[in-house]
A protein has these predicted regions:
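Short turn/helix-capping motifs enriched in Asx and small/polar residues
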Residues: 68-75
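Short, small-residue-rich loop/turn micro-motifs
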Residues: 59-61, 86, 165
Length: 271
């Protein structure tokens, strides 16, 4: 069992626990990865095993505002990145590096990095049917973005922060080789912060199959998008309204659940 938490010093700590009789064995806790955080915000937070069996870890840019240290575009730091590691290596190391990670062997680059140019990708998930990777990345003040990386990607994508916020200029600089979001929306009219979700693969709402369900923390509505074959996006606002959505979950049958800051857990059963 793996967990990602912010410790009492404000740093990111990914830990491993033995699992027995349906419970984590707290005495077995082992640090897998510890990352110093310079500020108290933008810690990221999501972790998930990919279809390839490796552990993916989302880390924000380190916080403050505007990425003052340029972490998003720097390959020398883990901040502002999506990482990909082997949490159970041989030889006594805390974790291993998959040999096909995109920056293995590159001078000055951290080999753990799978993707970069992210501001605060605190929620991401894999499509259980296709293996596609979906990332909800919180913007600075103007734009919220959703990124999608197709299954089978070789990694190394640059999603633009802080040169770009979404697909729009932010700090300036060359945008060559950057990957734009598949969907973005402007902040305003009650929106403030995207909460990434899951591609719906359940049976309760057949017409939602293949749609990526997400939310905005401030707006409260559940939203859904679906990519067309030509790369354009269909969008719909779902009926469900839940305030302060902080996370989503998906059960073994593909049904989607939303969690709110108030402590509620809600299953999506209709549009």
């Amino acid at each position: 069992l793996y967990a990602n938490r912010t410790d009492t010093e404000g740093d990111t700590r990914v830990t491993e626990f033995a699992f027995a009789d349906g419970h984590a064995v707290t005495s077995s806790e082992r640090d897998v990865l510890v990352v110093d955080q310079p500020y108290a915000n933008h810690n990221g937070g999501a972790i998930a095993f990919g279809p390839d069996g490796y552990l993916y870890i989302a880390l924000g840019d380190g916080g403050s505002g505007g990425d003052p240290h340029g972490n998003g575009q720097s390959l020398s730091t883990l901040l502002g990145k999506l990482l990909r590691i082997d949490p159970r290596p041989t030889g006594g190391a805390a974790y291993g590096i998959p040999p096909d990670n995109p920056f293995v062997g590159q001078d000055g680059a951290r080999p753990e990095i799978w993707a970069y140019g992210l501001r605060n990708p605190w929620r991401f998930s894999f499509d259980r049917e296709t293996g596609d990777l979906w990332i909800g990345d919180v913007g600075q003040n103007a734009w919220e973005e959703i990124d999608m990386e197709p299954a089978g990607s070789s990694g190394g994508r640059n999603y633009g922060w802080n040169v770009l916020e979404g697909s729009h200029p932010y700090a300036g600089g060359s945008t060559g080789g950057m990957t734009p979001p598949v969907y973005e929306y402007a902040n305003g009219d009650g929106t403030c912060s995207v909460t990434g979700g899951y591609v719906y693969r359940g049976s309760a709402i057949r017409v939602l199959d293949g749609w990526y369900v997400f939310a905005d923390y401030c707006l409260g509505h559940l939203e859904a998008i679906r990519l067309r074959a030509d790369g354009s996006v269909r969008h719909k606002r779902l009926i469900a309204t839940v305030g302060a959505i902080t996370s989503f979950g998906q059960d073994p049958t593909g049904e989607v659940y939303a969690m709110s800051r108030s402590g509620g857990v809600y299953r999506l059963t209709s549009l």
